[in-house]
Amino acid sequence: MTSLPVLLFLIILLLPSMITEGRVLTQTGKEATIFADQKTNHEADLKNPDPQEVQRALARILCALGELDKLVKDQANAGQQEFKLPKDFTGRSKCRSLGRIK
């Protein structure tokens, strides 16, 4: 049952950042640099996110949560007391290519 709080925490933590990925201001609060081939209204994107991007972000989160849940169960079955996330977990994840946001 400890995996459920971890999963909920990851959803709450990752969802806002995945939806607005690449569309936020820097820490100084200055407007982000816009390249010549990037013609987007960032404020409009933040107010009205593209439903497809939201769907892709949710698909990536659900995929990652499924992999994390499987990893937790595998470690529990192996009798490990501590949860140890492999260093290359994010690099080898099947979810990286799933629903890639522009």
Curated annotation (Swiss-Prot):
Expressed in the extraorbital lacrimal gland from where it is secreted into tears. It comes from Mus musculus (Mouse). This is Exocrine gland-secreted peptide 1. Its main location: secreted. One of its GO terms (cellular component) is extracellular space. Changing D69R: Reduced neuron activity in the VNO. One of its GO terms (biological process) is positive regulation of female receptivity. It comes from the Eukaryota. The record marks E67 as: Required for activity. Changing K70E: Reduced neuron activity in the VNO. Keywords: Behavior, Disulfide bond, Pheromone, Secreted, Signal. One of its GO terms (molecular function) is pheromone activity. It is found in: Secreted. Male-specific phermone which is recognized by the Vmn2r116/V2rp5 receptor in the vomeronasal organ (VNO) and enhances female sexual receptive behavior (lordosis) upon male mounting, resulting in successful copulation. Disulfide bonds join C63-C95. Changing R96E: Reduced neuron activity in the VNO. Belongs to the exocrine gland-secreted peptide family. Monomer. Changing C95S: No neuron activity in the VNO. Residues 1-22 form the signal peptide.
